[in-house]
Amino acid sequence: RVVYHQLDSGEEQAALLLMATSGLRRSEVLGLTPSNFDLENRGVYPQKADGQTTKQQWMSFYSPDTEAKLFNEYDFDQMDPDEPLFTRHPSTFTHNFADASGKVDSMRITPQVLRVWFCQKMSSLGVADRHIDAFCGRTSRSVLANHYSDYTPENLQSIYEDAGISVLD
């Protein structure tokens, strides 16, 4: 939370919140466009450059505080559906996150640290590992997992909402 408040730009704050509450990789978050969002359900469908869904990912979600920041920073209705939300170079985000961490004598925060924090936080909130893996784009390819695990968007959203992850609370 303290690192978030040290960031100078709303764009960087929005990126930090998305990385921390969705479990997505830096490249996935920084490649997002308005067309990747399901705004009604706070869902996000990251895509690779070729337009394919990343790895085996169905979708991930983001928290209410992230939603508020996104709507504060971006007017999704006025943006082109394929216009990137984040315009800075990826290394700029990593560098500025680390600088903000240093200002408050915090552990060095990087996009990877935020992804690890997401996994640990969701686990501490009682979310099963297989669902955390799904949010992070690591669904199993095993027959057992494919046929007996419910990775529907509705089920994943319910699990995410029940966990109640937040950075700013």
Located regions from the model:
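N-terminal core-binding DNA-recognition domain of tyrosine site-specific recombinases/integrases
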Residues: 5, 10, 89-92, 108-113
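Short, polar N-cap/turn motifs at the start of nucleic acid-interacting alpha helices
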Residues: 37-39, 108, 127-147
